[in-house]
């Protein structure tokens, strides 16, 4: 087993928040996270991206990716995402 995997318990997925996950880099990162055994959770305000990119990533990866259309400056909305998921890491691609 590779040391890159943190997903050690069957049926348990380490959830990773991906800000800007509908952009080019974020959506491709989601595919790689899933391939490595992680569960991406995406937040994006779609100001310079399209949700379609994330939908394509889901199709490529063969998995659903939770998505929240919020701005990362919205503390209440972001707190709600953290209350719904056990986020263990954050990858910040929002710009």
Task: Walk through the language-model features, giving the residues of each.
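N-terminal Rossmann-like NAD(P)+-binding domain of SDR-like oxidoreductases, especially those catalyzing
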Residues: 1-95
């Amino acid at each position: 087993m590779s040391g890159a995997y943190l997903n050690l318990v069957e049926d348990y997925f380490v959830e990773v928040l991906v800000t800007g996950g509908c952009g080019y880099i974020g959506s491709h990162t989601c595919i790689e996270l899933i391939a490595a055994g992680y569960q991406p959770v995406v937040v994006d305000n779609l100001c310079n991206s399209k949700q379609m990119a994330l939908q394509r990533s889901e199709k490529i990866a063969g998995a659903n990716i939770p998505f929240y259309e919020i701005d990362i400056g919205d503390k209440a909305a972001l707190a709600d995402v953290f209350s719904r998921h056990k986020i263990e890491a954050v990858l910040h691609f929002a710009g």
